[in-house]
Amino acid sequence: MKVRGTVVGEVTMRTVSTSAGERELAEVPVRLADGTTAADGSADGTATHDHDTDAATSTRSAVEADRPDVDATTVTLWGKWTESADVLEPGMELVVTEAERDEFRGETQYATTTDSYVVVEPSYLVDVTDVRNWVQCPRLYYLNKLSGVPLNYPVVTGTLVHEVFGDLLRGRDLDASIDERIEERALELGLLGESAESAAEDVRQNAAAIEGWLEQGRLSEEDDWRSEQLLISETFGLKGRADAIRRGAPVELKTGKNLRKEPRFKDKVQAALYALVLEEHGGSIDTGTLLYTKNSALDRNEETGDLTPAKDFSMGRGLLEYVLRLRNEIAAMEASGTVPTGKEADAKCEYCFERDTCMVVSGRLDQESKAGQVGQALPEAELDHFERFYRAIEEERREVHREYGKLWEQTPEERADDDRAIVDLEFVEARELDGGRWELRARRGSSGTAKFREGDLVLASDGEPVGGDAELARIERLDEDVVLTADEPVEVARIDIYPSELTTDRLLVALHDALLKGDERRKDILFERAEPEFESLDETFVGNNAAQDEAVRKAVGARDCALIHGPPGTGKTYTIARSVDAMVERGERILLSAFTNRAVDNALEALLDAGIDPDRIARVGTESGVRSDLQHLRLEREGDPDERVRALEDAQIVAATTATCGSRIMKEQSFDVALVDEAAQLTEPGTYAAINLAERFVLVGDHHQLPPVVQAENELVESLFERLVETYPDAGVMLDRQYRMNQRIQAFPSREFYDGRLRPATPAVASRTLDDLDGVSRSALPADRRDPVTFVDVPGDGERHTDAEEAARIADLIETYEAAGLDREDIGVIAPFRAQVSEIERRVPADVTVDTVDRFQGSSQEVIVVSFVASGDLDGPIFEDYRRINVGLTRPKRALVLVGDAEALESDPVYRRMLDWARS
Ligand SMILES: Nc1ncnc2c1ncn2[C@@H]1O[C@H](COP(=O)(O)OP(=O)(O)OP(=O)(O)O)[C@@H](O)[C@H]1O
């Protein structure tokens, strides 16, 4: 049976005499999660898919851990498992598989058996490659998290060899694969100063060994290969991508040589972890294979040793248990928030390539380390900042892991309802593409409103995203059909949101770079030790708008930073374009960034409108990320390395999302100034990713609109923009003339959110109404809809996340506006919950945009209808936070209709004032 629970007290270690001699044991007081005491019926004793344990097991709180352990049970861990007991602390979660139950002095107890596995913090999904680092030295694991994978030649060739390996498994020709893969990485090779020819030669040397080996057992039927498999383990708390699976067993590829008979230990560890996951999903693995690509390329006269590239090893039970204990050490360290010192392992610092980095990081962050420290520790405030944000980012990582957890905790229907999956796909075909990848096509059973977008990376599966045939795939098209591209021909029946840790990984690196590599002057600003300085400029940049003019002057003249606060429709994008134009004139190199691709593209469009030469611009992003009409600005990565690198380095303006700013390629670039739009939607470390690359920075945003998108409630919710606007009011300018809304529409948001400072930019803006639109006449509307702002009282139907009555009234309203001559494309409907969005979508024509506020930020419409879904006594603001309602109310240009239950809305002071305005 499987036992799962929370550790509620100190662990007792003992040695006892048994018939088999002296044995170690650890007694762990555990409060069992609901349902675990029931005898486990499943044959393999692992899967207890119990949804109810969620709340009890996923949140560890001090309160829980401190509760008197009246209902605690003793779980005894025998033998080597005492090593895992050693890392346990109260509050941590514990799982024992195949445990035995025992009655002892009238109490039920549990103990490990010879078939048991012990898992610490199973909901923390440790990455398999992280365990490989950890086994070399725990400190190496930590350093890798902080500094990420740099752009260097071994990393790039390693990736290329892996890609070619995958291609060979898919039956591609070696030369064709090498040529194509090298071409795809032209930009990276160019940045490293490598030629395509020499890189191809290096890859070929490595790949020849693989090819030779594959030839021997040539991809026969019974060999049953597949390349790259995403593996996730619910029981063992592991995830990773195995290089290949052959006859159900893991094969790992290592670019390098190994002349011993046995695989390297750390490589075995990695393969063994994949084997554990494969066993969980029903496999039975007795061997693992490591493939050392350099072995057969060696000159046989010079080297002696075992030259076979492929080395098999037997996957003993002892090894599997050992690697799981390693995994447990990582999970426990992350849960307790400690930093490894390197003393945990017996690695020799003298031989370590990372020794210098290790010493510098220890010195700067004042951490104990086996290698010793060099350099001066950061000031107290910076150390504190680092620790707080490190913890906050790790909390965010746990939220990502929780998303993984939902893959097995939720039923397919629940996931579909939550917009986390499309589950009713009917597989149509898998078509092989040039280059060995696959195009997968499936038909949708219903038109759900899942959050998926074209270009998203998703988990495509045969219906079982964990344990079944699943692969990462990219959405190429999404209408009544779903078209995906993937490495494997999965018979796709379902797609799920892929919980990526890339963002969290990059946040940590950005934090590290900002504090440890950051310019001192910038840190003085970030740590509020110095006032930002400005060069005084006499030029006029914008003749018809004083605030914009001042903003451009600040942006251009900033020696450290400038902050442009732009309420809705006040010409943020216009001001950015003017600023960039002026910076280009001065010969500066500019990084133009924003949280979303959409905002980056909007800014670029404005630059083109302002007459900036497109040849000066390089847009860094994927093909699906960049708007189709701006593809000509996109930096091509494929081709000739020299040409590609010149295209990037000669570009005076480089535009990319902040996430992309953290990529290996962008991290090699430097700029005079970084200009970041949507800065109020970025976390602090998210903003660092862009500003780390430049001498000075300009942040543009509005902290009264949407806050940073984060799952955890912690430091990350306040943007750097907001913090700096408050700290340095003199470095900021608020744009106060809006070019969007009729005066009536603007009145309430201006008063409520901008101290009444927002005004129409021109009389024409102030007086715009629907009558200005071709073929539209307000007189054709019912009298109570003619005002630019109106309210429709619909008593709520009592449901929490939907309101069918409101949805029906909205459908009627849309007909009314259409009858008055309005195009359906000019109407937008905003609802607070996805469920209500679906409810409304079912009733209105498809060309009316219906969405949540988050999707509307940054856009505008002629007419906006807001559905409030408010009922009862409003136990919290409906749009979660007033910033969301501000966004909702400021989208329309000419008409705004609020639909909701007046009585419920009036119970909240802000909504009451809103109703007073709408009804006045
Ligand atoms: N100084 C100006 N003179 C004339 N037109 C302007 C000026 N500033 C902005 N505009 C116009 O006002 C409109 C809104 O400007 P812009 O798109 O820059 O606003 P924004 O603040 O970026 O909007 P959002 O709040 O949606 O991000 C655009 O059509 C723009 O051309």
Predicted regions and their residues:
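Accessory interdomain/linker segments of ATP-dependent helicases and helicase-like nucleic-acid enzymes
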Residues: M1-E22, R355-V466, P788, I814, ...
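OB-fold and OB-like beta-barrel modules that bind single-stranded nucleic acids
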Residues: K2-M13, V87-E103, T108-D115, D456-D462
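OB-fold (S1/OB) nucleic-acid-binding surfaces
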Residues: M13-G79
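Mg2+/Mn2+-dependent nuclease catalytic core
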Residues: G35-T37, A62-P90, D224-R325, T449-F452
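Nuclease catalytic cores
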Residues: Y124-D175, D179, V203, G375-Y390
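A non-catalytic, helix-rich entry segment at domain boundaries
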Residues: V164-R226, F389-E403, L407-I422, R437
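Pre-ATPase regulatory/linker segments immediately N-terminal to the P-loop/RecA-like helicase/translocase core
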Residues: S296-R317, E321-E329, E454-E550, V620, ...
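Conserved helicase motor core of SF1/SF2 NTP-dependent helicases
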Residues: R586-E588, A594-D601, A610, R644-V645, ...
